[in-house]
Amino acid sequence: MPAAFFTCVVALWIPLWILGARPQSELRNLLPFNLPISALTALCPGVAAVALAFRAGNGRAARRLISHAWDYRRAANRWYAAALLVMPGIMLLSYAAMRALGRSLPEANLSFTDATLLIVPFVIGAFGEELGWQGYAFDPLAGRLGVRLAAVVLALFWASWHAIPFVETGHDADWVVGQTIATAGLRVIIVWLYVGVGGSVLAAIDFHAMTNVSDFMFPVNGYYDPFVTGILVLLLAAVALRVMPRGATRRNAP
């Protein structure tokens, strides 16, 4: 049930949030790219989903949940392509917009090797999140609220959770607000891809991982303005929300 899932996720998050908030904690230096220890909360939705699935149906249900996350649907190749290419495209447009606005930007230093090294940890993190958000929580939520409203509710919850790690990375208030708003839009896009593919968690994982890779590669280790990027994300999210089915789909009907 969605309520049990969200409660379990928050219970798993709290200790990591507390650890990440300790300014003198040596744990703050364990993760790369200035990530706070609270970034490990990315694994919490998946852990909560597997635990609840195991409780409901023992090991078979948990294995089914995990295997569903890698369910590739050949007929939906265009959706998988969108999942991989949409966010790099948004970041390129964001870079062009910042150039046009006269923003001071470092020279782009894109490295295929760096991008390849980033993919593995970000796929692991995306798997941990999307196994819970889309693989476990979304369908029951959409069955109750309809696809559009479920997308908005999940987006608000997800963005609120991200705000704490954003603060713990030391960014100023404007950056945190802009990034949090953009994050809500990203979840709506993830739901759009998930529904478009016909309930593929793999599409959600692909988009989520490429979002993080694109952010850190722009153009040097995440040097971007979340308000500029956020406007582009919200525009696409608004279109995605408009074309989504209003009510429950056949997959998530109660």
What are these regions (language model features)?
Residues 4-10, 14-55, 78-83, 108-117, ...:
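Alpha-helical transmembrane segments in multi-pass membrane proteins
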Residues 10, 43, 84-85, 119, ...:
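Residue-level signature of the transmembrane alpha-helical core
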Residues 43-53, 120-131, 187-188, 232-242:
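Hydrophobic cores of alpha-helical transmembrane segments in multi-pass inner/ER membrane proteins
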